[in-house]
Amino acid sequence: EIDFDFLEKTLQKNKKRKIIASFSLASNVTGILSDYKRISEMVRKFKGIVAFDASSFIPYKNISCQYYDALFISSHKLIGGIGGSGLLAIKKDLCGNKPSFAAGGTVGYVSRTSQCYLCNEEALEEGGTPGILQLIRASLAFKIKDSIGIKNIEKKEEILKDYFFEKLKTIPNLILYAKNLKTRLPIFAFNIKGISPFDIAYELSKKYHIETRAGCACAGPYGHDLLGLKDNQKLKTKPGWLRISLHYTHEKEDIDYFFNALNKTIVKLSH
């Protein structure tokens, strides 16, 4: 969870500097949700810019634009979003009159000695061949989400999350990370003592056709904290965990199937 005392001290220490605060709305490892309303209020008290990474958050929840100045979205995490484009929602007053990277489609006119850029903010930051099909796919993915309805999604996710929590308690030698925090998405990261998460993921995929994620999930520094590792510590094997992400299209029967497969896999790999 966010250490708000530390955040307040950091903001206070840097109050005379330009502050750009970027936070993840939800952990892609443990599913822990950030209190974005409190973050936004605190950062803006110091006249800072608020940016949120909504990659893991956006498939399950919505956020009002009043709480951020910039929002980063990965549409491929939504149903139907595979191949969809990444999205940036940003306030116009944060956009300059020059592109971050000059490229085809951003320049209005160029000579040997000068150039002028387009005045359209979207065109300035979309140099090169536009990903039209990718953008259409992203749009359709959000239409599916909206048609299902956020209330229906959240209700189903709570049911699945609680059920999964109870089933986890039946597995011996299981280490669940951030286990005491309930304000989370139905994303779980755990290890089984004495068994490699990579071996478990391989067996679940090969024999039971269950796709999980083994490793550090692009969260190495956070992983060091979760696993109790020291910086620059020499390791004999690659550290990590097994991550399970539930979805509102799942049913309790899918969870039962997973735990049946997990139990059989543990027995097999323990010998």
Describe the residue ranges of each PLM region.
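Pyridoxal 5′-phosphate
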Residues: 1-271
